[in-house]
Amino acid sequence: MRYEHVCIEAVAHTLPPCVISSDEIEQRLAPVYQRLGLPPGRLELMTGIKERRWFEPGTLPGTISTQTARAVLEKSGLDHRHVGALIHGSVCRDQMEPATAAGVHAGVGLPASSLVMDVSNACLGLLNGMLVIADMIELGRIRAGIVVGTESGRDLVEGTIDSLLHDSTLTRQSIKPAFASLTIGSGSAAILLCDRKLSKTGRRLLGGAFLSDSSAHKMCAGGVETGRHGDGRPRMETDSEGLLHAGVALAQKAWEQAKQ
């Protein structure tokens, strides 16, 4: 899809206050590392991730998303009455229903005429939300829209650490699917898009494309399994190498399609 009337007017983010290093995580996993003969520094060496950030315990995604949405609206200088859509585009949410976007919409004070919904699609939620809003602007249905999301990785990492520490059957092979979970951090971002005629910046969104390889859908799967893990924290299992190869191959095909 090519756009003629869509601009990326502003981008904003909220950075979590708690810094957690890869060394700290490995120190907590010292009994596992010692039993399996894993060298310290492995986590940073294999991923390049020195540290990640988390929000304070108990922080709801919608609370942070409200702050970020307010920030992007203020940064744009756009009258909030022009915002015709608010999409919450992260994996993390305040509850199953209503949509987390509803609380953000109320917190920011956007018009009742705005479309309000969640779009949750793994790491792609914000990009998917951008295209939904861009399509609406291009069609003339709205003049502006905000897509915002907040991911909170604390519970996933903490839960993974506890599971690894209490798994007496763990081997160097069986720990691999949990490895990617130890890299997860937190953060929040928002993008405001608007009609070209409304834009002060003229920064156009030229287009977007999508392509799916659903055969790879089992390479990274996460969620809450209370019966299996004994608590309500999420866990995730990832075939990191397989996912990388599948993702790069798909990205190449999508890029070639987008250029046509």
Place the predicted regions along the sequence by residue.
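Condensing-enzyme catalytic core mediating Claisen C-C bond formation in acyl metabolism
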Residues: M1-P57, L170-H245, K253-E256
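Phosphate/pyrophosphate-binding loops at sites that engage ATP/ADP/AMP, CoA/4′-phosphopantetheine
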Residues: T68-G84, K253-Q260
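ATP/NTP phosphate-donor binding region
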Residues: L60-P61
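Short, hydrophobic/amphipathic alpha-helical packing segments
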Residues: S65-A69, L126-M130, V248-W255
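Acyl-thioester C-C bond-transforming condensing/cleaving domain
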Residues: Q34, R70, E74-H80, D94-P98, ...
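Short glycine-rich or small-residue beta-strand-to-loop segments that form or flank ligand, phosphate
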Residues: A85-V91, D118
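Short, surface-exposed alpha-helical segments at coil->helix boundaries
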Residues: G37-P40, T66, P98-A102, V248, ...
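Short glycine-aspartate micro-motif
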Residues: H5-C7, A85, R143-V147
